[in-house]
Amino acid sequence: MKQDLMKGVIDMHVHTNPDLRLRAYDDFELMEAAIRVGARAIVIKTHQGTTMDRAYLCNRHNEIVHGKTNNFTMFGSITLNKVVGGINPKAVDVALRLGAKVVWLPTQSAKN
């Protein structure tokens, strides 16, 4: 695949390690791969709660290691499974105030 095909891409849904299931990449490996191909952003997701703290650390690492040499941003999210109390407005409020950009409805604890 030509590397420039990924330039500017935004992936809205990527699962990374650490996770209860083994994933292909951890947060930092995914960030570095995304920077290499010129991706614009990635939203990291877990079924076990939140990822905005992990996204913050990736963005901080990117800033320290790469400076202003790319425009990549990692975004975090919250998934409203039982781990965070299900449909929990307080958890959503805190997640958004801590930087989450996506709120996922229940997945593993959904009744459907």
Question: Residue spans of the language-model regions?
Answer:
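An N-terminally biased module of ancient metal coordination in phosphate/nucleic-acid-related enzymes
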Residues: 1-73
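Active-site beta-loop-alpha junctions enriched in small/polar residues
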Residues: 15-17, 47-49, 77-83, 106-110
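Extended substrate/RNA-proximal surfaces in nucleic-acid metabolism proteins
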Residues: 69-71, 81-112
